[in-house]
Swiss-Prot record:
Disulfide bonds: none annotated. InterPro entries: SurE, SurE-like_Pase/nucleotidase, SurE-like_sf. The gene is surE. It comes from Thermosipho melanesiensis (strain DSM 12029 / CIP 104789 / BI429). It is found in: Cytoplasm. GO terms for molecular function: 3'-nucleotidase activity; 5'-nucleotidase activity; exopolyphosphatase activity; metal ion binding; nucleotide binding. This is 5'-nucleotidase SurE. Keywords: Cytoplasm, Hydrolase, Metal-binding, Nucleotide-binding. It catalyses: a ribonucleoside 5'-phosphate + H2O = a ribonucleoside + phosphate.
Length: 255
């Protein structure tokens, strides 16, 4: 397959290079990724400002391009400017740290995959669970084998797969599970600190809350050493609540 690879950790981050090296053993790979780290930029795109694209050479077996923008910018430019056609598959990652539960809302990695989904390209976001000790080779080996058994052409437009891989040696993985995006979230707080001149600044902190009763919650699979595979959608309409609203306000809604 012709695979376009992007990320949010930056074009020369260890995760994306590990992923591209493994994929290039069996596929044609092109890397188009941000020239600087873009973690937690969500689905931002660059408007009314220029974007720069440059090819970089670090002696790899695949072409690498750096973009002065976000992961979503990279996907757009990768398809329209670099490849000039849709690839067979887009993979965003390997992210340093998980993208579980509400992480998905903020993640540049996941947004890169969703941008591919908008463009009609089968797309996958992949993350290594641990930020402190990400095992990229485990995730790279997994995705290479996963592509042998999973029909990526079955992924419908506007849908992407969000994959989270436990940070354990590859041989310790128990397999993969189909999961749901969980209600895993953070209880945020801000720590006040002093800058060198004595002024106040704030550092955002957070405690993880994992109390989702759903047995298919994504984080539960990862905790049990399974790879979590969650189909996610570009569209955010709460269909259940919409139906309840329609029933309640049917006579009052403007037609």
């Amino acid at each position: 397959m012709n695979i376009l690879v992007t990320n949010d950790d930056g074009v020369t981050a260890d995760g994306i290079l590990c992923l591209a090296r493994y994929l290039s053993k069996k596929h044609e790979v092109t890397v188009v990724a941000p020239e600087t780290e873009q973690s937690a930029v969500g689905h931002a795109i660059t408007l009314r400002f220029p974007l720069w694209l440059r090819k970089i050479d670090i002696n790899e077996e695949f072409e690498i391009y750096a973009v002065s923008g976000t992961p979503a910018d990279c996907v757009k430019m990768g398809i329209d400017v670099v490849l000039k056609e849709k690839p067979d598959l887009l993979i965003s990652g390997i992210n340093r740290g998980n993208n579980l539960g509400t992480d998905v809302v903020y993640s540049g990695t996941v947004s890169g995959a969703l941008e591919g989904a908008i463009a009609g390209v089968p797309s996958i976001a992949i993350s290594s669970f641990s930020f402190e000790n990400p095992l990229y080779e485990t995730a790279a080996k997994f995705i290479l084998e996963f592509l042998e058994e999973f029909d990526v052409k079955s992924i419908p437009r506007f849908t992407a797969l969000n994959i989270n891989v436990p940070s354990v040696p590859y041989g310790e993985l128990k397999g993969w599970k189909l999961t749901r995006q969980s209600k895993r979230m953070y209880e945020d707080y801000f720590e006040q600190r002093k800058d060198p001149s004595g002024g106040n600044y704030y550092w955002m902190m957070g405690n993880i809350i994992e109390n989702d009763p759903d047995p298919k919650a994504d984080y539960k699979a990862v905790a049990e050493k399974y790879v979590s595979v969650t189909p996610i959608s570009v569209f955010l309409t709460n269909e259940e609540y919409l139906k309840r609203l329609e029933e309640r306000y049917e006579d009052k809604a403007i037609r």
